[in-house]
Amino acid sequence: MAIEFVPVLLGSDINAYSMARAFHEAYGVKTIVYGMFPASVCAGSRIIDYRVREHNDRVDKVLENVTEVAREFPDRKILVLGCGDNYLNAISANLPNYPENVIAPYVSLDMLETLIHKEKFYELCDRYGIDHPATVVYHKGMGHAFELPFDGPFVVKPA
């Protein structure tokens, strides 16, 4: 079976290595990984083509790197995946700009920004009847004199 795609991972931490290993085990492919630093768990791996690029998570650099691979493999689909939150905005911002052979399975930047904003996300859940945990978003102006509309146990986490 001829492999008709090239996985491209943005980020060089253990998540990227694990995904590259999964692609190698499933398809026998070598994954291209873009990282910002020469020292990485991905550097020196036989299953990874590790490419160091400064400011790799910037919108312009993501487009530059992905376009480089698309031109290098014009006869294959290029599957772009971010391995870290800092890459999501840059990948989504470039959706309209990628070459024809690039697949980036992400939502538009507008939708991404809506989904990562907790209050907007829960409003969408309510609108479409999707269950979600009861939530209170604390705003600085609320001070200390507020009551939760539900009993514990509960989880408190910063946004």
Please state what every model-predicted region is:
Residues 114-159:
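Active-site nucleotide/adenylate-binding loops and adjacent lid/helix of ATP-dependent enzymes
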Residues 1-110, 127, 141-145:
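ATP-binding N-terminal substructure of ATP-dependent carboxylate-amine bond-forming enzymes
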